[in-house]
Protein backbone atom coordinates (compact mmCIF):
# COMPACT_ATOMS: atom_id res chain seq x y z
CA UNK A 1 0.00 0.00 0.00
CA UNK A 2 2.96 2.35 0.34
CA UNK A 3 1.81 3.51 3.77
CA UNK A 4 4.16 4.98 6.35
CA UNK A 5 1.98 3.58 9.15
CA UNK A 6 -0.93 1.15 9.42
CA UNK A 7 -2.70 0.52 12.72
CA UNK A 8 -5.47 -2.03 13.27
CA UNK A 9 -8.24 -1.03 15.72
CA UNK A 10 -10.98 -3.36 16.92
CA UNK A 11 -14.47 -2.23 17.94
CA UNK A 12 -13.58 -1.63 21.58
CA UNK A 13 -10.53 0.38 20.57
CA UNK A 14 -12.63 2.50 18.21
CA UNK A 15 -15.14 3.19 20.99
CA UNK A 16 -12.46 4.68 23.26
CA UNK A 17 -12.77 7.84 21.14
CA UNK A 18 -15.80 8.74 23.29
CA UNK A 19 -13.33 9.67 26.04
CA UNK A 20 -11.68 12.29 23.83
CA UNK A 21 -12.90 15.75 22.93
CA UNK A 22 -14.41 16.15 19.44
CA UNK A 23 -13.60 12.76 17.89
CA UNK A 24 -13.74 12.82 14.06
CA UNK A 25 -16.32 9.99 14.06
CA UNK A 26 -19.19 8.89 16.30
CA UNK A 27 -17.69 6.25 18.61
CA UNK A 28 -21.12 5.32 19.98
CA UNK A 29 -22.20 4.16 16.52
CA UNK A 30 -19.39 1.57 16.28
CA UNK A 31 -21.04 -1.85 16.12
CA UNK A 32 -19.63 -5.10 17.52
CA UNK A 33 -17.04 -6.81 15.32
CA UNK A 34 -16.38 -3.64 13.31
CA UNK A 35 -12.71 -2.91 12.82
CA UNK A 36 -10.76 -0.01 11.47
CA UNK A 37 -7.45 0.57 9.78
CA UNK A 38 -5.67 3.81 10.47
CA UNK A 39 -3.45 4.34 7.44
CA UNK A 40 -1.02 7.22 7.13
CA UNK A 41 0.70 8.24 3.92
CA UNK A 42 3.73 10.53 3.91
CA UNK A 43 5.54 11.66 0.80
CA UNK A 44 7.12 14.85 -0.51
CA UNK A 45 5.09 14.50 -3.69
CA UNK A 46 1.39 15.33 -3.47
CA UNK A 47 0.93 13.41 -6.74
CA UNK A 48 2.32 10.28 -5.07
CA UNK A 49 0.05 10.71 -2.05
CA UNK A 50 -2.93 11.20 -4.38
CA UNK A 51 -1.98 7.99 -6.22
CA UNK A 52 -1.75 6.03 -2.96
CA UNK A 53 -5.10 7.36 -1.78
CA UNK A 54 -6.67 6.45 -5.12
CA UNK A 55 -5.32 2.89 -4.81
CA UNK A 56 -6.73 2.62 -1.28
CA UNK A 57 -10.15 3.83 -2.43
CA UNK A 58 -10.14 1.36 -5.33
CA UNK A 59 -9.20 -1.46 -2.96
CA UNK A 60 -11.92 -0.52 -0.47
CA UNK A 61 -14.54 -0.48 -3.24
CA UNK A 62 -13.50 -3.96 -4.44
CA UNK A 63 -13.22 -5.51 -0.98
CA UNK A 64 -16.63 -6.72 0.21
CA UNK A 65 -15.67 -6.49 3.90
CA UNK A 66 -14.96 -2.75 3.72
CA UNK A 67 -18.04 -0.86 4.88
CA UNK A 68 -16.73 2.65 4.52
CA UNK A 69 -13.59 4.67 4.06
CA UNK A 70 -13.02 8.15 5.36
CA UNK A 71 -10.18 10.32 4.11
CA UNK A 72 -9.02 12.78 6.75
CA UNK A 73 -7.01 15.71 5.47
CA UNK A 74 -7.78 18.24 8.19
CA UNK A 75 -4.68 18.59 10.39
CA UNK A 76 -6.68 18.81 13.63
CA UNK A 77 -8.72 15.69 12.79
CA UNK A 78 -5.53 13.79 11.93
CA UNK A 79 -3.94 14.82 15.22
CA UNK A 80 -7.08 13.77 17.11
CA UNK A 81 -7.12 10.35 15.44
CA UNK A 82 -3.47 9.74 16.32
CA UNK A 83 -4.11 11.03 19.86
CA UNK A 84 -6.90 8.46 20.19
CA UNK A 85 -4.60 5.72 18.89
CA UNK A 86 -1.67 6.73 21.11
CA UNK A 87 -3.97 7.06 24.12
CA UNK A 88 -5.57 3.70 23.51
CA UNK A 89 -3.69 1.69 26.16
CA UNK A 90 -3.91 4.31 28.92
CA UNK A 91 -7.62 4.81 28.18
CA UNK A 92 -8.40 1.08 28.15
CA UNK A 93 -6.24 0.65 31.25
CA UNK A 94 -8.20 3.30 33.14
CA UNK A 95 -11.50 1.64 32.19
CA UNK A 96 -10.59 -1.88 33.26
CA UNK A 97 -11.96 -3.47 36.40
CA UNK A 98 -9.90 -3.26 39.58
CA UNK A 99 -7.60 -6.24 39.91
CA UNK A 100 -7.42 -6.94 36.19
CA UNK A 101 -4.54 -6.40 33.78
CA UNK A 102 -4.28 -5.08 30.28
CA UNK A 103 -2.34 -7.11 27.72
CA UNK A 104 -0.31 -5.10 25.21
CA UNK A 105 1.33 -7.79 23.16
CA UNK A 106 1.68 -7.70 19.40
CA UNK A 107 0.77 -10.76 17.37
CA UNK A 108 1.57 -11.76 13.82
CA UNK A 109 -1.18 -13.43 11.82
CA UNK A 110 -1.58 -14.10 8.11
CA UNK A 111 -4.10 -11.66 6.65
CA UNK A 112 -6.53 -14.43 5.71
CA UNK A 113 -6.60 -15.62 9.36
CA UNK A 114 -6.86 -12.19 11.01
CA UNK A 115 -10.64 -12.13 11.54
CA UNK A 116 -10.61 -15.64 13.04
CA UNK A 117 -7.68 -14.72 15.32
CA UNK A 118 -9.47 -11.62 16.61
CA UNK A 119 -12.68 -13.55 17.29
CA UNK A 120 -10.65 -16.18 19.13
CA UNK A 121 -8.87 -13.60 21.27
CA UNK A 122 -12.15 -11.88 22.11
CA UNK A 123 -13.62 -15.25 23.13
CA UNK A 124 -10.66 -15.92 25.42
CA UNK A 125 -10.89 -12.43 26.98
CA UNK A 126 -14.64 -12.80 27.61
CA UNK A 127 -14.19 -16.28 29.04
CA UNK A 128 -11.62 -15.04 31.55
CA UNK A 129 -13.25 -11.73 32.54
Enumerate the language-model features and the residues they cover:
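Noncatalytic alpha-helical scaffold of FAD-dependent oxidoreductases
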Residues: 1-129
Amino acid sequence: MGASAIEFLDDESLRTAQHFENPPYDPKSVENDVTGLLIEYQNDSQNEIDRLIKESKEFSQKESSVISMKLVTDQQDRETIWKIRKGLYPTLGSLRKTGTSIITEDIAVDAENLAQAIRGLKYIFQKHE
